[in-house]
Amino acid sequence: MEIKEIKAKSILTKSMLPDADYVINPYIGCRFGCVYCYASFMSKYVGKEIKDWGDFVYVKINAPKLLEKEIKKIRDKNVSILFSSVTDPYQGLEAKYKLTRGCIQVLTDNNFQGRVGILTKSHMVIRDIDLFKQIKNIEVGLTITSTEDQISRFFERNA
């Protein structure tokens, strides 16, 4: 497993998704390595092959600091932000780096009034319930592939 700390140039990305105006991806790559993941195309942006998906994660260590600057540019209260479109914001490394929590803290500190969406398959998401309670419009989506470990491991080798 390759883990690399990087400094990103930006963190709040304009989205072309129908239900999100912006996305925040605190990591490049995803340790879960799900065989069905559409985000595996991101491998090419860090010089990897699609088959390497799940074997590397690049950690955007400056994500909360970047968001602190970038969130001030959003004036519209009807804006939606999605965590995350091409990674799982609560994969295992989040326990160490706390980048997703840091970014959500920035939103609460700045009294963000828009909609926040979170997509994950990790139980770690419950760690941040205290912050979720401070956001007026938040949705958390959880993926549960199967209740049988053998089936889950087939599709999600590291989940």
Show where each model-derived region lies:
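Conserved AdoMet/S-adenosylmethionine-binding subsite of the radical SAM
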Residues: 62-159
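Glycine-rich phosphate-binding P-loop
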Residues: 34
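Cysteine-centered loop/knuckle micro-motif
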Residues: 37
